[in-house]
């Protein structure tokens, strides 16, 4: 598990977020922003590692998945499709937030068709990310 990096702090106990982002700088920024909401964060660098990591954990281990869409090895949409089909109690219901620079309506539509729960376009603000996460965990679906 050489590309799995855990960033943990005692900011709260909202659970663990799986961050899937191939750019290390973007991952560090997102990690700080997610931790501010009280989550622990585990980071993997591509969709294939996300599928592997999600599949090897117990149901309910992750409270949230933050998924970049454009990544090498396996993109975020394929990873989301596979996660949604895993034989795990939480595979169909864990919130998955897509983060992408592709802001066309067809990109958003494709994300939702592939099982994404919420969609954020890059560049995004910390406020946007926090609002989407808070709305998702409170009501189910959010988009900005």
Indicate where each model-derived feature is located.
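C-terminal compact regulatory domains
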Residues: 1-144
């Amino acid at each position: 598990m050489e590309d799995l990096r855990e960033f943990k702090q005692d900011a709260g106990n909202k659970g663990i977020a799986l961050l899937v982002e191939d750019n290390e700088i973007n991952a560090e920024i997102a990690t700080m922003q997610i931790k501010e909401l009280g989550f622990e964060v585990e980071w993997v660098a591509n969709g294939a590692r996300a599928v592997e990591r999600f599949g090897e954990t117990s149901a309910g281990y992750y409270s949230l998945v933050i998924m970049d869409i454009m990544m090498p090895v396996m993109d975020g949409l394929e990873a989301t499709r596979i996660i949604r089909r895993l034989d795990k109690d939480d595979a169909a219901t864990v919130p998955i937030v897509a983060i992408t620079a592709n802001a066309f309506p067809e990109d958003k539509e494709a994300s939702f068709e592939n099982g994404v729960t919420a969609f954020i376009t890059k560049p995004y603000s910390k406020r946007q990310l926090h609002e989407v996460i808070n709305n998702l965990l409170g009501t189910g679906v959010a988009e900005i």
